[in-house]
UniProtKB/Swiss-Prot annotation:
Keywords: Cytoplasm, Endonuclease, Hydrolase, Manganese, Metal-binding, Nuclease. Its EC number is 3.1.26.4. Manganese or magnesium. Binds 1 divalent metal ion per monomer in the absence of substrate. May bind a second metal ion after substrate binding. Its cofactor is Mn(2+); Mg(2+). Residues 27-213 form the RNase H type-2 domain. The keyword Cytoplasm applies. It is found in: Cytoplasm. Endonuclease that specifically degrades the RNA of RNA-DNA hybrids. The keyword Disulfide bond does not apply. It comes from Geobacter metallireducens (strain ATCC 53774 / DSM 7210 / GS-15). This is Ribonuclease HII. Gene3D superfamilies: Ribonuclease H-like superfamily/Ribonuclease H. One of its GO terms (biological process) is mismatch repair.
Length: 213
């Protein structure tokens, strides 16, 4: 078994990276992605997905390009056909304690650890590797070029959105159900008026200015 070479892979499809890795002897390839690095409130959620080779998932793409109903539909398809799905969560307190990058990597590692099928290779969206002793490849915009990463992006996004809908019930007035914690004008105005709530990220600009000394 040798590590795959990604330098010249020619014309690409959403299965290109998975197929290349499989041809090099790896058979449990997990795509890993996150949702929620940028918001001012709530957790960062990561997902890891292992798909059966050649699985047909029409419509799967970067979750940010899909409508909420489309994501929910695809979430069901992915959950039904995947060999394994894992989810990891780093909450607001963890983010404030160790910073958003380290919290994201921790959530990703947790997601991989939750997989019922142990992966032998990881495809990761972005530029940062996960602190796990597994062969892995980071892919910029991987959620638009890898079927496994795209699937993980959908699982992570839907999972986090559902959490933020619940937080909207616990902490009314901030509009979490609408903006999911992102720093839009209405959210910033709510923070200025009401002050931060328990799930706000106290180290983030837009929130820290309103934290009592």
């Amino acid at each position: 078994m040798r590590l795959p070479l990604f330098d010249d892979i020619g014309e690409r499809s959403l299965w290109t990276f998975e197929n290349l890795v499989s041809r090099n002897g790896f058979h449990a390839v997990a795509g890993v992605d996150e949702a929620g690095r940028g918001p001012l409130a709530g957790p960062v959620v990561a997902a890891a997905v292992i798909l059966p080779q050649g699985a047909e998932l029409p419509g799967v793409d970067d979750s940010k390009k899909l409508s909420a109903p489309k994501r929910e539909h695809l979430f069901g398809l992915i959950s039904g056909c995947a060999l394994a799905v894992g989810v990891g969560v780093a909450d607001h307190a963890c983010i404030d304690r160790i910073n958003i990058l380290q919290a994201t990597l921790r959530a990703m590692a947790e997601a991989v650890g939750q997989l019922a099928v142990p992966p032998d290779y990881l495809l990761i969206d972005g530029i940062s590797t996960i602190p796990l002793n597994l062969p892995q490849k980071t892919i910029k915009k991987g959620d638009s070029s890898s079927i496994s990463i795209a699937s993980a992006s959908i699982v992570a996004k839907v999972t986090r959105d559902r959490m933020m809908m619940e937080y909207d019930q616990q902490f009314p007035g901030y509009g979490f159900a609408e903006h999911k914690g992102y720093g839009c004008a209405s959210h910033l105005a709510a923070i200025a008026e009401l002050g931060p709530c328990p799930i706000h990220r106290k180290t983030f600009r837009g929130v820290k200015e309103h934290v009592a000394p």
